[in-house]
Amino acid sequence: MTEHEDNRIRTYLAIGDSFSEGLMDESALEDGRFIGWTDRLAHALTQSPVGSPNLLYANHAIRGRQLTAIIDEQVPVALDLKPDLVSFVAGGNDVLRPSVDVDGLAEQLERAISAMRAEGIEVLLGNGFDTAAFSPMLRALRPRVAVYNAHMWTLAGRHGCYMLDLWGMRPLYAPEYWAPDRIHLSTQGHRMVAQSAQTVLEGSRVDFRGFRLQKTSKPLRDRMENEAEWLKDHLAPWVGRRLRGTSSGAFLDPKYAEWVPAAELPLDARSQSGRNVSPAAHQAAADDAAASEAPGTSEVPDAPEPPGTSGPSDRT
């Protein structure tokens, strides 16, 4: 990422929605807060050649926030603090809505990105998950997310941002990387995304291969029961909140509103030890799984695995 030590990342601010707040990392803190990939990335950067042992970290991401709210509430914080790095992953809650103007979202994003880049802030973007890995009910969102992602790549190239390609990280589609709601990452998923983000910032490239989703082996009856349970426990409450005009994060404050030393972040023991499983190892495992399937048999899985995400890609 940098050529000189003076350009190392010494301050990092995460903004966005539930993804960057850290839901549903099972390694929750005692006060109920989640750890998440941005906490893990901040800690990892204290031991990275592009980071600093004394790196300071703040997190203003709040669950349920749509893009307009993030731009109105969180981007001004970034412009005020002027951190070395901002991770800005947003728009997922907007794209889920039928009336969304995807081109309009891109225009909003560009204004926010331009403002931060004009202040010399490095920006790490993340694109949308492949919703074909969601429930069949949400598979129809895939074209909309794909258009949004195309805009994201354009913005990254246009403004010199780093891109965390969450769409293309096919190893992340495995069920163990997702929470039961099929929308948020598990602890393993957050670890993998943090590792990939670090790889991007360090200027390395990991060859995540493949395009198809892993074929499910569950019987049809089990898949139908799993779908019904998900609709009742997760989708119905979400729709109810939308109809009432409420948000799960309506009354929440930022997790880390002020700077905290990233080296002292409370992470679980496996995270403290560093990269326990490399992105390349994840890809190798995915290749082994794919080798057992005949070409062309891959299809959408039905386990708790939301839109897949993609691994690192170089800065554009």
Where are each of the predicted segments found?
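Short glycine-enriched, charge-decorated loop/helix-capping segments at active-site entrances
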Residues: E26-G32, V100-D103, L138-R142, A179-P180
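Short hydrophobic segments within beta-strands
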Residues: I15-G16, G126, T216
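A short helix->loop->beta-strand "cap" motif at the edges of active sites that frequently abuts
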Residues: A118-V123, C161
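Substrate-gating cap/lid alpha-helix
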Residues: A133-W167, T187
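Oxyanion-hole/transition-state-stabilizing segment in secreted/luminal serine hydrolases
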Residues: E21-D25, G51-P53, L67-G104, D130-T131
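Serine-esterase "nucleophile elbow" of acetyl-processing enzymes
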Residues: M1-R63, V75-K82, A280, A286-D288, ...
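Charged helix-capping and loop-helix junction motifs
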Residues: V102-E110, R142-N149
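Conserved catalytic region of serine esterases and O-acyltransferases that act on ester linkages
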Residues: D6-R8, R158, D181-H184, Q188-T316
